[in-house]
Amino acid sequence: MASLDGKVALITGAASGIGKAIAELYAKNGAAVAIADINQQAADAAAAEIKAAGGKAIGIEMDVTSEDAVNAGTDKAVAAFGSLDILISNAGVQIINPIDEFAFADWKKMLAIHLDGGFLTTKAALKHMYKDNRGGTVIYMGSVHSHEASKLKSAYVTAKHGLLGLARTLAKEGAAHNVRSHVICPGFVRTPLVEKQIPEQAKELGISEADVIKNVMLKDTVDGVFTTVEDIAETALYLAAFPSAALTGQSFVVSHGWYMQ
């Protein structure tokens, strides 16, 4: 059984969805978890649930697009738990539109949250992971769209592709300091982020919501089944607990066969 006893994890976007599932599983397996989210109240609530179940957790308000906020939040996690061993860069949003109608402000917002956020949290975490070559694991939440493309998602696809480059560069640079990195690439997971997309895509594509699910989101899976937050959390646990750098700089697609590499 994987164990994270004595480890400290900082997880962004962890008040709900995939991030919360990872935080809960990490805590069950011995890690102290810092729940970082732009919504302080929601972060505190998620941390309280973990503590009520016997785990160690703290809620931290963090806007991943602000370097000052990221640095302050990361330092707060280290002050609370003494170290930082795992970073999960998970915060994200979705905005869809055709390229010719995509507002530049929305484009910049998407890249700021997904890609700048990944960079800023990594930079802040490395200050602690590089110290005395302590090491650590950085996991970026990518997507099948780190490898594929879909209509209406130019900014999202661009940002998720960018995380592959960041992770691979970190794998090479971080090796000297015992830092590993990966990208988890889920298929569609029925989180609030995806629930929001269903009516949006139905309207934009002129089809029913049922058709969006069956013929857009799950069309290329082998079984027509959504990936779950538990699937992603188990993958994140496996990668964080893996005992060596035999796995680093890799992309792990968890998508019911939607994308096979």
What are the roles of these predicted feature ranges?
Residues 100, 148-155, 176-177, 224, ...:
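Active-site loop immediately N-terminal to the catalytic Tyr-X3-Lys motif
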Residues 127, 131, 172-176, 245:
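Alpha-helical segment proximal to the catalytic Tyr-Lys
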Residues 143:
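Residue(s) in the substrate-gating loop at a strand-loop-helix junction
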Residues 122, 159, 167:
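Active-site helix of classical SDR
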Residues 148, 236, 244, 248-261:
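Short C-terminal tail/terminal secondary-structure segment
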Residues 88, 175-180, 247-249:
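Short, small/polar-rich loop/turn modules that mediate ligand/substrate recognition or access, typified
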Residues 98-99, 103-111, 217:
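Substrate-binding pocket helix/loop in short-chain dehydrogenase/reductase
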